[in-house]
Amino acid sequence: MIVRLGAAGVVYAVVVDTAYFTGNYPQACSVEGARVDGYGDVASAAEWEPLVPRSPLTGDARHVFQVSSDRRCTHVRLRIYPDGGVARLRVHGTVVPSPSLLEGLTFDLAALENGADVVACSDRFYSSPRNMLSPGLSRVMGEGWETRRRREPGNEWLVVRLAGASVVSLAEIDTSGYIGNSPGAASLLGCSDPAALEDPSAWFPLLPRTALLPDAPHRFRLSDARPVTHVRLDVFPDGGVARLRLHGSLTEAGLAEVRRRWVETGG
């Protein structure tokens, strides 16, 4: 079976789950990866390299395989021996976006598919904060970031590492689906030094504390043109956010870093 990945990236783990297959599971499996530019014929264009060697499987069990490759993949191929059922295949990795698709454009700097990620978070009781950076719209509350009710002083927050050093010009904070549990307000801070994220003085305001509506998308133009590598979202005091979008463009330094990662993982 060949799977085209959701985004090109470096694979660090593969999960082969044989849940509920007790008498008809494969005896073993192996996984290979390939990099195919564009949308060509994978069967003829791909040069496959091993990610997971042939490994034994058991029935009704979740098997996690660590991958040590530093090469970028666009496709993976699962082989099972000799046959049988697999409930789920999960391929975990780090997205490596193509610089040719980002250079000179305004795009969502906080999107997982563009290489962004959540690097810190105050609460993940109900769901992962990474949900907010996923493609498309949230259909239910579980597809966004929902915090527990905060019973102590303070507020909930998270920090997003952007696709690269960039200037953010527009923010979207979407509370769709959160009616009785949306934040009352939110703010955004920016930081341009990845080594100073723990220093409060390194952060500067992008969006002041602003009231939010429940079950509604919000768009805010940002006037601060200083480059940032990380953005902190604060919600007051807690609540759910379906999607966070941060639109802008890479700086020259940010584009150079994206190019470097692209070359290092396969050119």
Predicted feature locations:
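Beta-sandwich interaction modules
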Residues: 48-85, 155, 162, 166, ...
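A short beta-strand element within beta-rich, extracytoplasmic domains
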Residues: 9-20, 78, 167-178, 233
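Acidic Ser/Thr/Pro-rich low-complexity disordered segments
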Residues: 37-49, 103-108, 194-204, 262
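Eukaryotic modular interaction domains in large regulatory/scaffold proteins
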Residues: 141-172, 177, 195-197, 202-218
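Short, surface-exposed beta-strand/strand-loop-strand elements in extracellular ectodomains
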Residues: 22-37, 181-194
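Predominantly extracellular/luminal cell-surface or secreted proteins
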Residues: 17, 32-36, 92, 174, ...
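Short, structured interface segments
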Residues: 86-97, 246
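Disordered, acidic Ser/Thr/Pro-rich linker "stalks" and the adjacent N-terminal cap
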Residues: 1-4, 94-163, 179-181, 250-267
